[in-house]
Amino acid sequence: MASKESKQMITGKSFEYSLLVQFEEKLKKQTNVQVIKNSSFQIAKECFESVSVLEQSEYSLSASFAVNFLMDIEPRLSNDIGKDDILQLEILSDDKGKKGDVRDVLAIRLLQKWEIGVSAKNNHHAVKHSRLSSSIDFGEKWFGIKVSKNYFDKV
């Protein structure tokens, strides 16, 4: 039997894969899409393929709703500025999260110098709790501006 941690990893990676697939399926009809098939992609795909068909369907449905919402509020996902404006989709490594970047799936338009990231949480306690900590300077990591000593003293 899989441990709780490994089951959470499998479900989390499965949902990340579902999000990326839904982005690709919905957006390839409207713009040029390129999926970055790195090691994180391969791991997520293997996790997705290891769960039941019912779980795959549930993840895909949830991901579909999320992607539809994001497409409604973020026009750059589906609107390119020409045939060379490729939307790259990537699953980030967990190492990024350890360094303060909590995004799991990234959509990038290099030509527009634009990106949007999604922190994929599926029935997970992290939805209720931020990933801020007393040791990671999220201001420096996210914005290039250090948080105050007062912040760290209070956290």
Where are the language model's segments positioned?
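Acidic-basic catalytic patches of nuclease active cores, encompassing PD-(D/E)XK
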Residues: M1-D95
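Generic signature of intrinsically disordered, low-complexity, basic-rich segments
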Residues: S62, K113-E115, S130-R131, Y151
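Enzymatic toxin/effector payload domains
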Residues: I81, H124, K154
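A short catalytic or substrate-binding loop motif that flags glycine-/basic-rich loops and adjacent residues
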Residues: K96-D101
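Active-site beta-strand-loop-beta-strand hairpin of nuclease catalytic cores
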Residues: L106-G117
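Short loop/turn segments at secondary-structure transitions that flank enzyme active sites
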Residues: L111, N122-V127
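Acidic, metal/cofactor-coordinating or nucleic-acid-engaging core segments within structured domains
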Residues: V127-V155
